[in-house]
Amino acid sequence: MEEYQVYLELDGYQQYDFLYPLLFREYIYALAHDYALNRSRISLENGTYDNKSSSLSVKRLITRMYQRIPLSISTNDSNQNQFFGHNNNLYSQMISEGFAVIVEIPFSLRLVSFLEGKEIEKSHNFQSIHSIFPFFEDKFSHLNYVLDVLIPHPIRPEILVQTLRYWVKDAPFLHLLRFFLHEYFNWNSLITRKKSISIFSKSNPRLFLFLYNSHVCEYESILLFLRNQSSHLRSTSSGIFLERIYFYRKVEHLVQVLANDFQDILWLFKDPFMHYVRYQGKSILASKDRPLVMNKWKYYLIHLWQWHFHMWSEPGRVHIKHFYKHSINCLGYLFSVRLNPLVVRSQMLENSFIIDNAMKKFDTTVPIIPLIGSLTKARFCNTLXHPISKPTRADSSDSHIIDRFVRICRNLSHYHSGSSKKKSLYRIKYILRLSCVKSLVRKHKNTVRAFLKRLGSEFVEEFLTEEEHVLSLIFPRASSTSRRLYRGRIWYLDIFCINDLVNHE
């Protein structure tokens, strides 16, 4: 990879047709199975390649796509449809993997070189989802209003292709990608008209997640540029995504015009307390400013999507919420800022005063209703949250069934360990524990009381989380101390993905 690094580096003011010649070289297809790119400390992918994605098959299929062989594909979404004489899902996944490898190579190299130039510490702890929550706790407790934004998604593949024009100045490759996306759009297997962010198929996540993120980064770069005009602490983590051809010239000209003619409008963007966070298909824009300014931001985002990115967005997709009156659903938690009244009695000479203070506290709770809905879909309980028996295989052993429920329970407890109120978490653990018992009772055709009597306390100990075991070992005689520490919020730096039950959105 080092010998190709100089060749693949992009110059923002020149045009390099780097992807087109690489499509016809042998080594580019082998990169799909080469882990040299993955051995770097920074990786842009969420998983590994499928062994079925043969580099030779990818090469042949891309070559036949260039030859424009007529396709005979029915309109029905079926796995039996033939794509170049082969199974649709299998070979479309091969092609998408080939596209993803080719597109990600220059961006991976530029990202690594960017981080080396900035001397940013490459710690794996920064990849943890829980590392975001201390930032919320430190910053959001001083803010007043928040924009809860549901990001619109492009329903036409042409919008995704146009987004890449700022990154890739290679017409043949863009035409090939456009042809591939339009064929998928006709099959209605990867891109659909659903409202959720799950418009991309789970079997082909890499390429389409890259396209979606690059599309969202287009409008985020504008927001970040305007945000940094008034901030002394410039953002560096997203600096690699801000490199656009003629982008800074356009925005600087826009800011100059606004500064000369519309001083009040420019003041909208000069907010040093503005914080932006994006997760899945939503984003949060929090500020300490007044509701009028937040309303301006709302309609600014809507017009930016509609007129600049050609995406229809309704005003109802952007909600203005007061932090002290509403909660924000983010990453499986409900965030809110609670005002705790504090009465202090002060005495000066013969006069005494009573001072009322309101202390702000950042509150994190478990969204019990959506989580019970996820347990209902997974058939752990009914709609009323009453535990039910989950069907199991006849040849499954009791230890295997218990280990499965214990693993689910510990993962949920591990992820929601930062909750300030553990009662909801205890209820979820109770549902899983009793569902496990009913599943075993159903298998052995016994009663719940008789089964629990036979297992005893060993069954309950299986569901204890790791932190409970550790605290009980540290404080064996001070049970109240360990109980108080466990009830507090605990953030972990080893959580890299959201559990399927937590990801109920």
From Swiss-Prot:
InterPro entries listed in its UniProt record: Domain_X, Maturase_MatK, Maturase_MatK_N
Subcellular localization: Plastid, Chloroplast
Keyword Transcription: no
Pfam families: Intron_maturas2, MatK_N
Cellular component annotations (GO), alphabetically ordered: chloroplast
Keyword Chloroplast listed: yes
Coiled coil: none
Top-level taxon of the source organism: Eukaryota
HAMAP family linked to this entry: MatK
Function recorded in the entry: Usually encoded in the trnK tRNA gene intron. Probably assists in splicing its own and other chloroplast group II introns.
Family assignment from sequence similarity: Belongs to the intron maturase 2 family. MatK subfamily.
PANTHER family with a match to the protein in the record: MATURASE K
Official protein name in the record: Maturase K
